Structures are given as structure tokens and as C-alpha cells.
Regions:
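Acidic, surface-exposed loops and disordered segments
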Residues: 1-177
Length: 177
């Protein structure tokens, strides 16, 4: 049997995406509370998210195209995207690091617990280091996560970051314009 480079690279990207999800899941977390969520999108689901990014760009920027449309173009050239999210809820430490008096005030004021961002960052770092170890091109994009939050991929209030994946002769995420 002959395996073409296209098929092998596509399989490598999906294998990497699985391992990235595992790395995000097993990353250290505040108080050991696991609020991490992961998803992998391919094919038409990538295109739908890219469309959402372009629609959001035009809506937020008075019909002008900005970085959201640029990033949507990067997403369209990706074989897969790993979404890593964290459920937006306080961790019960009442530390006030969020800027509120405590967790109840944070919830009432619709704030974001400091540890949500911390845990999301650690999980994403674990995921992208896995991709790097496997020589899969990737880039962390808040723009993808911003628009993924509008797609209702998960119940509740989730903060997402997107990690598009590629295997091409040149990293498409390197010199974006």
C-alpha cells in the first residue's frame, strides 16, 4: 500500500490534536479543579468558524476588515483547530485577585476569576508544546476563541483559545499580514 504525503500529514495533524487535548487535560490546575474543555474542528466546521470570524469582524468594526478576517484566512488554511477552553466560574478562594471583594462579588459583577485565565494559559501551553514536539505548525489565537464562544460549542460560559494546526512547506502563521 502507498500512503501519500497529504494523507499522512492529515493523519499526523489529527494524532497531534488528540495528544494536545490530552496535554491540556493533564496540565496542572488551581486546587486540582478541572474546568478545562477541549474540542477539535476539521473540514466544514473550520469553515463555519472562519465565516463566523469574518462576520464578527465586519459587525464589530463598522464593515472594515481587521485582524479577525486575517486570522479567519489562517484558519481556512489549517487542517484542524484545537479549541481549549475553561468554564468561567470562580475557584472559591475569595482572594480578591479578580478585583472584587471575593468570589460572590465577582459572580455578581460578572467578573472573571483570575485563576480561569491562569489555568487556561497553562493548559494551552501544554497543548502547544505537544504540537511543537511533534513538529506540527501552530499558533495560539484569541481571535479564534473569541468567535468560538459565540458558536455555542459547550454549555455554560466558556472562555476559549484556538490553536490552528498545519503541515505545509512554510508555517502559515509566521508572517501574517
Amino acid at each position: 500500500m502507498i500512503y501519500t504525503s497529504d494523507k499522512m500529514e492529515e493523519a499526523a495533524v489529527l494524532d497531534a490534536a488528540q495528544l494536545m487535548c490530552a496535554a491540556a487535560r493533564t496540565a496542572p490546575k488551581t486546587r486540582g479543579i478541572d474546568n478545562v474543555r477541549t474540542l477539535v474542528l476539521t473540514g466544514d466546521d473550520i469553515l463555519a468558524l472562519a465565516d463566523k470570524m469574518e462576520e464578527t469582524d465586519l459587525r464589530l468594526n463598522n464593515g472594515e476588515r481587521t485582524f479577525l478576517s486575517r486570522d479567519a484566512g489562517n484558519l481556512r488554511r489549517s487542517k484542524a483547530v484545537v479549541l481549549v477552553g475553561i468554564e468561567k466560574k470562580p475557584y472559591g478562594l475569595n482572594c480578591g485577585y479578580c478585583g472584587f471583594e471575593g468570589c460572590a462579588a465577582c459572580v455578581e459583577g460578572k467578573g472573571t476569576c483570575f485563576f480561569c485565565g491562569t489555568d487556561l494559559g497553562i493548559a494551552v501551553s501544554s497543548a502547544v508544546s505537544t504540537a511543537a514536539n511533534l513538529r506540527i505548525d501552530c499558533r495560539v489565537m484569541f481571535s479564534i476563541g473569541r468567535c468560538a464562544a459565540e458558536m455555542s460549542y459547550a454549555e455554560g460560559n466558556t472562555i476559549w483559545l484556538g490553536i490552528p494546526l498545519s503541515t505545509s512547506g512554510k508555517n502559515p502563521y509566521f508572517d501574517r499580514k
